[in-house]
Amino acid sequence: MTTPQIDERAMEAGAAALQETIVDPGPLDVTALAVAAALAAGLHSAADDPAAALDKCIVLDELTEFAEKLVVHDRPGGIGTTVEYVEVYEDASGVRLGTATGNAVVLKMEPHMWQFHQSVSELADGSFEAVGVIDCTAMLRRMTQVLRVTGRSGRYAGKSGFMTLAISDPNQRPPHYSVQVVLC
């Protein structure tokens, strides 16, 4: 079955992840992510209790992300191929929290596919932008990717931090991703 607004390659990404012979999940727990964000914001020192970083930041944990719309504009050889997408965020109960609208550009195809990503996430309490370069091959092996996040409006305005992204359910079509966002 093809969903008209999602490119078939995106729908099959979970199947590709299931076929990977090297599965190496490396989740970064939310406390470690908060320490990194608080250190980057100058609100935390290495000597501080790691758990204290959680109190200094806005933490969005146990989010699920999946494609609602994904369009690929192919280029010969793959490099320069662009992707436009709208992703849905749900909480642990399956309640829709908002969307991320963004784009990606394929930077390199071999031996790993590297992509530049930029998106703006709109939630009821504000928005933030995520930017970074991710290793899609590593992601198919269920390795966690980290993007830089900057608050744009609402309770996120003026704050910065990080977002993690990892395939959580490759059996879904499109696959579901586990997301954590921490801004300080």
Curated annotation (Swiss-Prot):
<feature type="binding site">
    <location>
        <position position="115"/>
    </location>
    <ligand>
        <name>(1S,3R,6R,8R,9R,11R,14S,15S,19R,20R)-8-ethyl-9,15-dihydroxy-3,4,6,20-tetramethyl-21,23-dioxo-24-azapentacyclo[20.2.1.0(1,6).0(11,20).0(14,19)]pentacosa-4,12,22(25)-trien-25-olate</name>
    </ligand>
</feature>
<keyword id="KW-0045">Antibiotic biosynthesis</keyword>
<keyword id="KW-0413">Isomerase</keyword>
<keyword id="KW-1015">Disulfide bond</keyword>
<dbReference type="GO" id="GO:0016853">
    <property type="term" value="F:isomerase activity"/>
</dbReference>
<feature type="disulfide bond">
    <location>
        <begin position="57"/>
        <end position="184"/>
    </location>
</feature>
<comment type="pathway">
    <text>Antibiotic biosynthesis.</text>
</comment>
<dbReference type="GO" id="GO:0017000">
    <property type="term" value="P:antibiotic biosynthetic process"/>
</dbReference>
<dbReference type="InterPro" id="IPR041013">
    <property type="entry name" value="AOC-like"/>
</dbReference>
<dbReference type="Pfam" id="PF18678">
    <property type="entry name" value="AOC_like"/>
</dbReference>
<protein>
    <recommendedName>
        <fullName>Spiro-conjugate synthase</fullName>
        <ecNumber>5.-.-.-</ecNumber>
    </recommendedName>
</protein>
<comment type="function">
    <text>Involved in the biosynthesis of the spirotetramate antibiotics pyrroindomycins. Catalyzes the intramolecular cyclization forming the spiro-conjugate moiety in pyrroindomycins, via an exo-selective [4+2] cycloaddition reaction.</text>
</comment>
<comment type="subunit">
    <text>Homodimer.</text>
</comment>
